[in-house]
Regions:
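Residue-level signal for well-ordered alpha-helical positions
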Residues: 21, 41, 65-68, 77
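Beta-strand elements of well-folded, non-transmembrane domains
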Residues: 10-12
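Short, well-ordered beta-strand segments in beta-rich or mixed alpha/beta enzyme
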Residues: 2-8, 39-66
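Structural detector for hydrophobic anchor residues on beta-strands
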Residues: 4-6, 33, 84
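Glycine-rich beta-strand-turn "strand-cap" elements at beta-sheet edges
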Residues: 2, 40-46, 76-94
Length: 94
């Protein structure tokens, strides 16, 4: 089992632009057959700090997710509005 914690840092002036893209990314990812969990949270103290908590059966499933049409279209659009680079933490179940 693979758990992913991914953080995005969006410039505050671009939140209205990226929020619909995040909503679409979450909706379509949750429909992927190998997606176990895919949740997006917003930091209460920093509305530009988004945290994905994902669960996949294995690395191959995550790799397949990263090749989907919605991921390859939406993530570069979102990344254009980053205040700083994303952080991704991959963890195996203990």
């Amino acid at each position: 089992m693979l758990k992913v914690i991914a953080e995005d840092f969006i410039k505050p002036e671009h939140l209205d632009t990226v929020l619909p893209w995040y909503a679409e990314l979450v909706e379509k990812t949750r429909q992927e057959p190998l997606c176990i969990a895919y949740d997006l949270y917003v930091d209460q103290k920093d509305p530009g700090h988004f945290i994905f908590v994902e669960q996949w059966p294995d690395q191959a499933a995550l790799d397949a997710h990263c090749q989907t049409a919605h991921f390859t279209r939406l993530v570069p659009q979102i990344n254009a509005y980053q205040a700083k680079p994303s952080r991704v933490l991959l963890m195996d179940a203990f």
